[in-house]
């Protein structure tokens, strides 16, 4: 694995982020996971801080996520997620995100996943801990609504968007879309 905590077991299958790719072991053999975002992840991975990489499972959606630091960051600031439940070898489902979580506790321990994030610029709101340097962690309840609620109770909508690479819509896949004459269909 890319780090001591870069592997995780889900339903008898081990998944891990290696130094050059993603893999799984199903009890019989090791399989390389086809990944369309692999270059995006590895070209900006801070290998000097790879001990920060850790894997997490979200059984609510059938996902394994690896949280990792990018080049120029000593702390986790990005994630890559593999959907093991809906992926098939010909169509693996991967997503990338700036979701930065330094710890993760899956549902099962509690009703929903809980996680923490670390910020070097935040100031703790609890009594001073002797010997601690700057920075603070935030404790998050995941998968609860569509708004972010801070410790002070302030609520804001979670910023979200979807970005995709090019793909073809073939004749049998265009339900709900009507093309008339020569045309080009772009979604942005």
What are these regions (language model features)?
Residues 2-13, 19-188:
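Beta-sheet repeat architectures centered on beta-propellers
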């Amino acid at each position: 694995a890319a780090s001591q905590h870069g592997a995780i077991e889900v339903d008898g299958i081990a998944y891990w982020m290696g130094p050059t790719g993603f893999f799984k072991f199903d009890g019989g053999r090791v399989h390389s996971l086809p990944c369309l975002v692999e270059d995006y992840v590895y070209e900006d991975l801070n290998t000097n801080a790879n001990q920060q990489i850790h894997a997490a499972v979200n059984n609510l959606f059938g996902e394994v996520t690896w949280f990792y630091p990018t080049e120029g960051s000593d702390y986790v600031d990005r994630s890559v997620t593999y959907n093991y439940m809906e992926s098939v070898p010909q169509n693996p489902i991967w997503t990338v995100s700036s979701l930065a979580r330094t710890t993760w506790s899956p549902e099962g321990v509690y009703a929903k996943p809980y996680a923490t994030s670390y910020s070097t610029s935040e100031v703790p709101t609890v009594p001073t801990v002797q010997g601690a340097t700057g920075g603070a962690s935030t404790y998050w309840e995941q998968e609860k609504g569509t708004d972010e609620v801070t410790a002070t109770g302030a609520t804001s909508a979670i910023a979200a968007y979807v970005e995709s690479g090019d793909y073809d819509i073939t004749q049998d896949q265009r339900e709900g879309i009507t093309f008339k004459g020569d045309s080009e269909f772009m979604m942005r």
